[in-house]
């Protein structure tokens, strides 16, 4: 029996283990249901191509996270990239972000967007949903031509039922001067937004990050251990393979809705009903490798219009040329759906339609496709609806009362980055240490590199 059991050996779970060890605490075990650690940060090497679960790109704006990366691996192991992206709509490419780059669109679309921005509902005090939030900050025209169709595709949900609390740093705001300048001339906005610059491993795909963290952590995950029940009265976890283990505290990075269905013996009897209310969409990521040396110099392109089944298409060879064979190129495409409303047959048809459309858009024949790898993300984007907003905090508090700290992107049921996943694991370990060690806390580390220095590289 270990005092602490960590469920899930993705980035958050491994981060918790790493930070326990950094504090000198080793009375814990990690359990992972898959055949290897990593979760969605696994990479696949196929015939000279490297594919990830969509575009997992590393964004660094936290000093501790910078020091963490430089400790478990090295920034020298990463390529630093300045974003080169576009939006494809109305049969043409325009720069991203949309709200600052209307130049190149049809004149009537530009007029509609500017008029909508000038007459936007800025006086709306508290937007009730994402639809109203767009009307308040961007106006009806920009909503019509980008924000509503694109976000409807990526979330696969009604924009009037999605709350705007997820937007934060992910949707850059604008002003009238920026809108007008971006309408009449092409501007360089590559430095706008949280993803204006990113890091990506020179070799090994994004799994390099997981492998580095595994090497830096002495404790190894016990693989092929899928949780089926957590009895909070007897403090016993039962796994699908028949194994059981006792615990004092749990750090769970499992999807929150699944976790709630596993908990037994709690005084909080509403867990099962709550699990049904938590919504999250799914994404199919199709990866294609081509026997063609050049496609585009962009890193990815957004497709807001309905005629394209995918909402985004990225280009692996531009993110890292070593991701493909010499003289070849590769893409990733993403399309989302709400799992409860989509049968397996419908999903398969949707993916095949998306692949066929992607080849047409790129002007590539089926004969030029040398490799294909479809990856399914059963959990992709959490839906920020009214039920989540009202009940999530209490759910997490009740689980904590039952001895379960649920954290990470899906454990915390939120939209977050790899940086936040690592910090979530760090915080989880720090929260539990006093329970076993009194007032002792994690050893402080001196950051070898600051974010300011990183951005100067």
Task: Tell where the protein language model's regions lie, with residue ranges.
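Glycine-rich FAD pyrophosphate-binding loop
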Residues: 21-45
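C-terminal segments that line or cap access tunnels to active or ligand-binding sites in enzymes
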Residues: 247-249, 257-405, 416, 420-423, ...
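N-terminal Rossmann-like FAD-binding beta1-loop-alpha1 element of flavoenzymes
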Residues: 2-30
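Short hydrophobic core segments
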Residues: 7, 31, 245-259
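Active-site/ligand-binding neighborhood in enzyme catalytic cores
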Residues: 92, 109-110, 114-235, 246, ...
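A conserved FAD-binding loop/helix module that cradles the flavin
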Residues: 410-432
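Active-site-proximal substrate-binding core of FAD-dependent oxidoreductases
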Residues: 374-376, 433-457
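Dinucleotide-binding Rossmann-like beta1-alpha1 core, especially the glycine-rich loop
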Residues: 47-123
């Amino acid at each position: 029996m270990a005092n602490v059991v960590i469920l899930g050996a993705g980035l958050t779970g491994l981060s918790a283990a790493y930070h326990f060890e950094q504090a000198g605490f080793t009375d814990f075990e990690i359990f992972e249901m898959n055949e290897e650690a990593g979760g969605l940060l696994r990479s696949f090497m196929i015939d000279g191509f490297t594919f990830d679960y969509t575009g997992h790109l590393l964004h660094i704006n936290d000093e501790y996270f910078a020091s963490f990366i430089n400790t478990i691996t090295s920034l020298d192991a990463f390529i630093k990239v300045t974003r080169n992206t576009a939006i494809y709509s109305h049969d043409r490419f325009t720069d991203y972000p949309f709200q600052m780059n209307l130049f190149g669109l049809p004149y009537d679309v530009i007029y509609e967007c500017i008029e909508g921005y000038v007459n936007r509902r800025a006086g709306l005090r508290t937007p009730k949903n994402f639809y109203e939030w767009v009307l308040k900050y961007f106006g009806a025209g920009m909503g019509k031509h980008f924000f509503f169709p694109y976000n409807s595709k990526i979330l696969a949900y009604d924009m009037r039922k999605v709350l705007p609390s997820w937007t934060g740093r992910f949707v850059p705001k604008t002003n009238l001067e920026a809108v007008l300048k971006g309408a009449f001339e092409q501007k360089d906005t590559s430095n706008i937004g949280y993803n204006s610059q990113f890091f990506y491993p020179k070799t090994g795909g994004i799994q390099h990050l997981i492998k580095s963290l595994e090497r830096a952590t002495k404790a190894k995950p016990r693989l092929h251990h899928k949780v089926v029940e957590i009895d909070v009265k007897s403090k016993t976890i039962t796994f699908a393979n028949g194994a059981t283990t006792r615990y004092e505290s749990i750090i769970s990075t499992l999807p929150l809705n699944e976790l709630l269905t596993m908990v037994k013996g709690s005084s909080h009897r509403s867990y099962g009903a709550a699990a049904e209310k938590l919504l999250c969409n799914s994404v199919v990521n199709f990866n294609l490798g081509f026997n063609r040396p050049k496609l585009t110099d962009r890193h990815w392109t957004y497709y807001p219009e309905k005629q394209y089944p995918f909402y985004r298409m990225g280009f692996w060879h531009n993110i890292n040329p070593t991701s493909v064979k010499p003289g070849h190129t590769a893409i990733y495409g993403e399309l989302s759906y709400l799992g409860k409303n989509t049968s397996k047959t419908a999903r398969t048809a949707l993916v095949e339609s998306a692949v066929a459309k992607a080849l047409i858009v790129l002007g590539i024949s089926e004969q030029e496709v040398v490799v294909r790898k479809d990856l399914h993300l059963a959990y992709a984007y959490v839906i920020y609806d009214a039920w989540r907003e009202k009940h999530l905090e209490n759910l997490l508090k009740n689980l904590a009362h039952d001895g379960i700290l649920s954290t990470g992107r899906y454990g915390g049921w939120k939209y977050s980055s790899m940086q936040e996943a690592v910090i979530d694991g760090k915080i989880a370990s720090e929260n539990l240490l006093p329970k076993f060690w009194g007032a002792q806390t994690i050893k402080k580390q001196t950051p070898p590199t600051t974010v300011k220095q990183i951005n100067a590289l």
